[in-house]
């Protein structure tokens, strides 16, 4: 089984490519360095939850897209934490 960081990184790279963005462009949109984005995409670094939310909003995808169904308990714990998060109505 592949590491969850690698899977998430591949999904981010896929989204970036399908939307015609360079690492420099997406890194700027996410507020991270180009090097950090590259580390996320390669699965070297764990992605911060705030960056996950930005990716979801930028590409209009669900967390299930980034964290696909796997047998990994870590994935299930991440997904369950999002179930109870809803946007605040101001």
Regions found by a protein language model. Give the residues of each.
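Short amphipathic helical patch at the helix-1/turn junction of helix-turn-helix
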Residues: 6, 17-18, 46
């Amino acid at each position: 089984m592949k590491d969850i960081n690698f899977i998430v990184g591949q999904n981010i790279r896929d989204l970036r490519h399908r939307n015609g963005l360079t690492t420099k462009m997406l890194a700027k949109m996410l507020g991270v360095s180009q090097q950090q984005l590259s580390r996320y995409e390669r699965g070297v670094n764990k992605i911060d939850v705030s960056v996950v939310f930005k990716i979801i909003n930028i590409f209009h995808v669900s967390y299930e897209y980034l964290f696909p169904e796997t047998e990994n308990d870590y994935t299930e714990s991440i997904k369950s934490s999002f179930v109870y998060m809803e946007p605040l109505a101001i």
